[in-house]
Amino acid sequence: MAMATQASLFTPALSAPKSSAPWKQSLASFSPKQLKSTVSAPRPIRAMAEEAATKEAEAPVGFTPPQLDPNTPSPIFGGSTGGLLRKAQVEEFYVITWESPKEQIFEMPTGGAAIMREGANLLKLARKEQCLALGTRLRSKYKINYRFYRVFPNGEVQYLHPKDGVYPEKVNAGRQGVGQNFRSIGKNKSPIEVKFTGKQVYDL
């Protein structure tokens, strides 16, 4: 009787609510009551800030951000991506997608190796930097273009990269440079000339 009681404590509930998006299924088992017993009330400060930044920095004119298909299969990987962390339940996580011309082995940004499927692939990761690391590897070694998105706990999807449809290392006639200074560092003003002025040598 005691062993049956212990087994019931570690048996997951079978009546988890179904969702149309696969990333919601992993979060559906965490009800608000369970979160109260382990962590304090969620503070979606970063999510609110990201939503505000999204409204300000919209996609360039003439570029339509691609839509994320949640039914895209994931690569074949026998290990673990380290989990989506607790922040995926109260803030966000990231999804990277790409299309492979054939089934081939690639290195995971979290360690280990996986097999990408022929055609579309979708991989969920905890951090944006992991998506950038994997995307750089895909473009440099496999010559594969990629896209990644931010997914909020409420199911909202935000397209992140490449923002205007062109990768940063490529020339884009419509892209505005930020912090550009068309001179060598040797042509900067002497630091003593800008001392106590509140300016930097690269500002002049």
From Swiss-Prot:
Pfam families: PsaD. Its main location: plastid. It comes from the Eukaryota. Residues 1-48 form a transit peptide. Gene3D superfamilies: Photosystem I PsaD, reaction center subunit II. It is a peripheral membrane protein. PsaD can form complexes with ferredoxin and ferredoxin-oxidoreductase in photosystem I (PS I) reaction center. PSAD may encode the ferredoxin-docking protein. Belongs to the PsaD family. This is Photosystem I reaction center subunit II, chloroplastic.
